Structures are given as structure tokens and as C-alpha cells.
Amino acid sequence: LEGNTYSRLDTRALIEHGQAAQGKAASETQMILNHKSAIELLVENVQSAGNLDGQGGAAVAGLDRYTLMNLHAALSENLLPNPADEGRVRQHTVEIGHSVFRPLSLPQQIGDALDTLLAKARQIADPFEQAFFMLVHVPYLQPFADINQRTSRLAANVPLFRANLCPLTFVDV
């Protein structure tokens, strides 16, 4: 995870045994626990494309605003300066360091662009192409106050999970 100094061994101890690493910031521990929670959310709510009957009223994660907002909320819990920004479209201007690119700044425009992005993603038949589309376009849009890249990396797994394919794994990102 970007900005996190936990080793793989420390991460494993935290996830499997709840042991926070000594000398690490609480925000780093929270980041890992949030990631675990978001992955669990995906696994619990994604059904393969061949089993979409939704028996038992179970939610089915898809390339939709509901899934994206829930992923962001899980990933950003207790990490953003304003807790109201967790799991909602950005309400303020952001700047990207060392870049002249300026993302959309009006919440209505951001929401409309996000809906368009998700509609385009759903029109893509190939799950690998859908995954790549989400991976690239969510961070470019910057729909959230922060944690856009982490959200896109997990959202990219939705079409893969639904097609019963292995999720993306990033090492040293």
C-alpha cells in the first residue's frame, strides 16, 4: 500500500492475529485493516456471472456507484481529515502534486462523470478490459477526496471476481 511502511510479515501478523507492529503510525495500521475490510466486502458481495440470482437477498457487487462508494468508505474509514468524505463523491477541489492536471471541481460534474465512467465500464464485455478500465479511469477522475488509487485497484477486481478469475495483485506499489 502506498505510503505504508509495514513489512509483509508485520502485515500478516496484523491481519491474522490482530498484532499491530511496534513503532508504526496508527494510520498505517488503520490503512491495512481498512484494506482487509474492503476486500472482505468484495468477497462477501460478489457472485460469479453464472450465479447472479441474488438468493437470500445478498447484495451483488458490480460496477456501480453503490459498490464504489462502499469500497471507498471501507478503505477510507478513519483516514480522512473529514469523516463526511468517506464513501461519497468529492465536494471540494483537489490538486495533484507535481502536475498541471486539474480534476473536475463541481460535485455535480464529478458525480455525472462517475456515472458515465461506470456506464462505459459496464458496456465492456471482457473482464480484463473492464478491470484495466477501472484501474486507469477512477484515479484520473479523482472522484474522492483521497484514496482514489486504492479504490480503483479494488474496484478493478470486481469484474474479475464476477467472472471467477483471480484478482489483481500488486507488489511494491
Residue spans of the language-model regions?
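FIC/Doc superfamily catalytic core
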Residues: 1-173
